[in-house]
Amino acid sequence: MARIHPLSAVMSQNIGNETNIWQFCVVFPQARIGDNCNICANVLIENDVIIGNNVTVKSGVQIWDGVEIEDNVFIGPNVTFTNDLVPRSKVYPQSFARTIIKKGASIGANSTIIAGHSIGEYAFIGAGSVITK
């Protein structure tokens, strides 16, 4: 059974066993989170997001539509994902660029992942990096 802090707004029923979701998180209804994950405080997870098993997402991360995170991934604090390559206020694309974080990857604190890229298996992204290709 998942453990969800009472001060979080978790609307999804797709939360795996032994997953912890801490305070002030928001998880949209169609998000999918695997088993044995740790979703730290102040994390936002949108609808078109898939998170595998044994994933850690540290505080201050927003995971927007179009992001897939495979098993055994570490996402450091305040990592920023983007999902729209040409963002405009009140203009919504037909679909968002897909971003895939492959199994075992580690993304350091305050890194930015520009939409539409894949991070390879067991890759290590240093703190403060900006991934553009």
Predicted regions, residues:
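Structural signal for interior beta-strand "rungs" in well-ordered beta-sheet cores
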Residues: 2-133
